[in-house]
Amino acid sequence: MKKKSNHLKGRKVLVSLLVSLQVFAFASISSAAPTEPNDIDMGIAGLNYNRNEVLAIQGDQISSFVPKEGIQSNGKFIVVERDKKSLTTSPVDISIVDSITNRTYPGAIQLANKDFADNQPSLVMAARKPLDISIDLPGLKNENTISVQNPNYGTVSSAIDQLVSTWGEKYSSTHTLPARLQYAESMVYSQNQISSALNVNAKVLNGTLGIDFNAVANGEKKVMVAAYKQIFYTVSAGLPNNPSDLFDDSVTFAELARKGVSNEAPPLMVSNVAYGRTIYVKLETTSKSNDVQTAFKLLLNNPSIQASGQYKDIYENSSFTAVVLGGDAQTHNQVVTKDFNVIQSVIKDNAQFSSKNPAYPISYTSVFLKDNSIAAVHNNTEYIETKTTEYSKGKIKLDHSGAYVAQFEVYWDEFSYDADGQEIVTRKSWDGNWRDRSAHFSTEIPLPPNAKNIRIFARECTGLAWEWWRTVVDEYNVPLASDINVSIWGTTLYPKSSITH
């Protein structure tokens, strides 16, 4: 009996041991199993949006406009022609202005919504994990990266200053910065058009350069803007493997949703920021020449042509303005001049990065947290391209010195435009048409600046029964000129003529 009791006790101990082993094994398997996916990763992955549509901007839509207009001014006739154009751009390099510097630092979390598209991004403020930022200054090698605790505008800016200081103290004397210059130019037609063409907020251009958009639309002025961006260095934020890598463990997707994250406003991160200086140059003229754009482009490439050449008249009626953002901007905060060589000096001055000529955040790029794809703003705008043509008055000088009786016929069309821009043509005739003129006869016929389709005809009386009148001049569509000289001479059988203008 005692042996049996001991045997039962042994079996109980064995069973207990097996149960303990199973519990331990189950616990070990449970602890080794993969953890549940972070709800931030799941929430952002589940956002449903089209990245090409969420940042699409529908700019000006023009349904009606007056295609042509005629203006009488100071003895001249000015024709303003308007043509509807469309412009589509998808910039990924977004310009930075002072008002948004604290919303566009490397690693900043933004919302992809209309505010972002309008260059006034909204931030998502939440507790963050440390963030690695790096700089591409030459020579730093392993010293080019720093980990930022609690990344925000202040801490990231401080870290960037530290990286720049390290380069300045250790490597600036042995390493030079490569020249990285971005250049763009465009004629100005409307606020949305120039904003899209140069990828900059039109309000900034208007506030710094003073563009008179109304004068441009009315054809009173022609304006070109050139943008020079000189990049000294770029600071990049480390891209996360998962969105949750950016946020503290205490942050949930529900918190991000409360702070604006949604299908209509998915989250972004500023992946890199370019630092340097930006120079905006405004070229403005009151010239009505159709060669203004060509003249301005040539001047931008070669300022020495201002004093001579075929476009001298355009330059004499032009003024130039330059505004510098970044670097030692106080040296050339705003320069207004009629000498483009002064503008060229502004562009060349302070082109080297140094402690006295610091860099300024000039542009940034953001990525969608869902897949790290680049956030591009898709602009689509319509605008009116305005072309002005100025016509001056002219005159026809008739001179008859031939040995015969002559008759002249002169007429022309005068054109204008109605309120809808439709051309109105009125036929005008010289009151001396078909009168007999003997030598020597000379007269001047004034022509208004809106004259066209000029017709000049002259005939002489031969005295021959079978050919009483012989044509001497028979010209249609003579172009309007300040002086149109018509001369006839010779004899009845051998009349001569010439027209010069």
Curated annotation (Swiss-Prot):
CC terms in the record's Gene Ontology section:
extracellular region; host cell plasma membrane; membrane
What residue intervals traverse the membrane?
191-204, 211-220, 289-298, 306-318
Task: Print the keywords alphabetically.
Answer: Cytolysis, Hemolysis, Host cell membrane, Host membrane, Lipid-binding, Membrane, Secreted, Signal, Toxin, Transmembrane, Transmembrane beta strand, Virulence
Q: Does the record's keyword annotation contain Methyltransferase?
A: no
Motif Conserved undecapeptide, which positions? 460-470
Q: According to its UniProt record, where is this protein located? A: Secreted; Host cell membrane
- Activity modulation notes: Inhibited by cholesterol and thiol reagents.
> For the motif Cholesterol binding, what are the positions?
492-493
User: Residue span of the signal peptide, if any?
Assistant: 1-32
Task: Please name the GO terms of the biological process aspect recorded for this protein, alphabetically.
Answer: killing of cells of another organism
Q: What's the main place this protein lives? A: secreted
Q: Enumerate the GO terms in the molecular function aspect.
A: cholesterol binding; toxin activity
What membrane topology does the annotation report for this chain? Multi-pass membrane protein
The UniProt function text for this chain reads: A cholesterol-dependent toxin that causes cytolysis by forming pores in cholesterol containing host membranes. After binding to target membranes, the protein undergoes a major conformation change, leading to its insertion in the host membrane and formation of an oligomeric pore complex. Cholesterol is required for binding to host cell membranes, membrane insertion and pore formation; cholesterol binding is mediated by a Thr-Leu pair in the C-terminus. Can be reversibly inactivated by oxidation.
Summarize the subunit comment: Homooligomeric pore complex of 35 to 50 subunits; when inserted in the host membrane.
Q: Which family does it belong to?
A: Belongs to the cholesterol-dependent cytolysin family.
Q: What is this protein called?
A: Alveolysin
Instruction: Show the taxonomic lineage.
Output: Bacteria, Bacillati, Bacillota, Bacilli, Bacillales
